[in-house]
């Protein structure tokens, strides 16, 4: 049994290890659009990746020293209430701003400059929303329900009262997330303002029809992939809804006893959220260009190559995770079923998704932030000469730290989940082995992608 002092030493060791690795090399974030080449690492890639995978394995061994249940519970149950007097006002103002922003984005996409970096629609959607606002969902709190313009509009429309089939569960949101990212990768959605405005209009129309048919609460809870992404990211954030009001908690601690992941569709969505960010970065690597080139040269259409890669890669990610759940029943013999273990250990993966998203987009957001401001100030004519920031060479070390920090947080959350599930300490520790192996694999792949120079996806 570890004392609080021992646990503090373990935590300090983890932080020191992450910071040491962060200083070992540099890597630049990349995004699905407006890409720029990143710098190479200053250390051999094989050593970088091996060390990154080893630190996750070592962190698991260190975390196993914290076996005092009362100490673990004290960390995850720490809460501080926050004042919520501004809640109703915030929702009203947020929904109004959201509707205005939606209309403005569509108008700017149609009537604004054709150059992506000068068009406010492109800059607001990709830089302001999907990079900046998405980061705030897991770094601060999930404010999307209060801002979502489509939720605000549909909440004021009559509903048809149709019954949503329970058997579908969260699967429509899984398909929707994969489809959205696929379209974003294979089309000039991030470079063509007209296409972006059209796509947003189609998405809005589908959402309005669906929400009116089954009711906004059911639609945004089960079907809408964007709402689910932000809701899941919000569980990583230090501020969230505690039932009776907003509360401050330690980052990621809301993942330990989360009941929203209660079916195979929810598990599949968590894995999909990890996979789509990985896929978005994978297709910008030179290795992918070589593989895709070989297949396209053999006569296979490029879109088919990307589609198969998206579906097959997701199938591998999901299959590996499900196999880990089945294997956990053998490493820690238990009456709990593999699907139940899969549901219990899925929320920690959201810390991985958040860490990689932060590494993937923070540099992109900071680089294009001045251009975003300039585009908003000149929505129709566009800025004459958009300015992009040049990040210092050491910034790449932060990206490495974000990936590793996300994985270490995921391991700690999985540790708490295991101790909540199993009464025996050894059983709780052994149940984590397969899931930690999966996390090490995800870490190694993520670090490799971050380490690679960023190229435009080929053959598109």
PLM feature segments, named:
Residues 220-326:
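Long, internal scaffold/assembly segments composed of regular secondary structure
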Residues 338, 413-439:
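Interfacial loop-to-transmembrane junctions
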Residues 445-460:
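Juxtamembrane boundary at the C-terminal end of a transmembrane helix
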Residues 277-285, 318-326, 352-378:
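Transmembrane alpha-helix/helix-exit interface in multi-pass inner-membrane proteins
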Residues 327-359:
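Alpha-helical transmembrane segments with an aromatic anchor "belt"
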Residues 349-356, 367, 371-405, 411-415:
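Hydrophobic alpha-helical transmembrane segments and adjacent short intramembrane/lumenal linkers
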């Amino acid at each position: 049994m570890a004392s609080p002092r021992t646990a503090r030493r373990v935590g300090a060791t983890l932080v020191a290890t992450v910071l040491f690795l962060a200083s070992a090399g540099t890597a630049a974030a990349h995004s699905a659009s407006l890409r720029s080449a990143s710098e190479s690492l200053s250390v051999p890639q094989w050593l970088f990746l091996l060390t990154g995978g080893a630190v996750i394995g070592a962190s698991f061994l260190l975390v196993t020293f914290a076996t005092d249940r009362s100490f673990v519970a004290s960390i995850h149950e720490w809460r501080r209430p926050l004042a919520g007097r501004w809640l109703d006002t915030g929702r009203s103002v947020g929904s109004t701003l959201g509707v205005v922003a939606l209309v403005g984005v569509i108008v700017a996409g149609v009537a604004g400059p054709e150059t992506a970096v000068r068009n406010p629609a492109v800059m607001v959607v990709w830089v302001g929303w999907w990079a900046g606002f998405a980061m705030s969902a897991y770094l601060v709190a999930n404010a999307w329900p209060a801002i979502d313009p489509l939720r605000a509009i549909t909440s004021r429309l009559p509903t048809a009262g149709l019954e949503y089939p329970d058997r579908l569960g969260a699967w429509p949101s899984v398909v929707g997330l994969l489809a959205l990212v696929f379209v974003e990768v294979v089309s000039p959605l991030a470079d063509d303002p007209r296409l972006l405005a059209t796509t947003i209009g189609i998405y809005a129309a589908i959402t309005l029809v669906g929400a009116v048919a089954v009711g906004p609460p059911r639609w945004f809870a089960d079907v809408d992939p964007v709402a689910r992404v932000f809701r899941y990211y919000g569980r990583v954030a230090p501020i969230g809804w505690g039932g009776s009001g907003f509360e401050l908690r330690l980052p990621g601690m809301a993942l330990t006893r989360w009941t929203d992941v209660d079916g195979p569709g929810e598990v599949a969505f968590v894995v999909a959220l990890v996979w789509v960010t990985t896929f978005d970065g994978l297709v910008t690597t030179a290795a992918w260009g070589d593989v895709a080139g070989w297949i396209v040269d053999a006569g296979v259409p490029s879109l088919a190559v990307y589609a198969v890669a998206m579906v097959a890669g997701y199938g591998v990610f999901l299959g590996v995770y499900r196999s880990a759940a089945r294997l956990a029943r053998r490493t820690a013999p238990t009456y709990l079923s593999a699907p139940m273990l899969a549901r219990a250990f899925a929320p920690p993966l959201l810390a991985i998704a958040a860490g990689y998203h932060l590494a993937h987009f923070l540099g992109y957001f900071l680089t294009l932030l001045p251009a975003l401001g300039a585009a908003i100030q000149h929505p129709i004519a566009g800025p004459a000469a958009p300015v992009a920031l040049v990040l210092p060479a050491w910034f790449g070390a932060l990206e490495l730290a974000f990936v590793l920090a996300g994985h270490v947080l995921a391991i700690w959350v999985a540790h708490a989940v295991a101790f909540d599930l199993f009464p025996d300490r050894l059983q709780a520790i052994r149940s984590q082995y397969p899931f930690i192996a999966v996390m090490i694999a995800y870490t190694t792949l993520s670090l490799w992608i971050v380490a690679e120079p960023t190229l435009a996806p080929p053959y598109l």
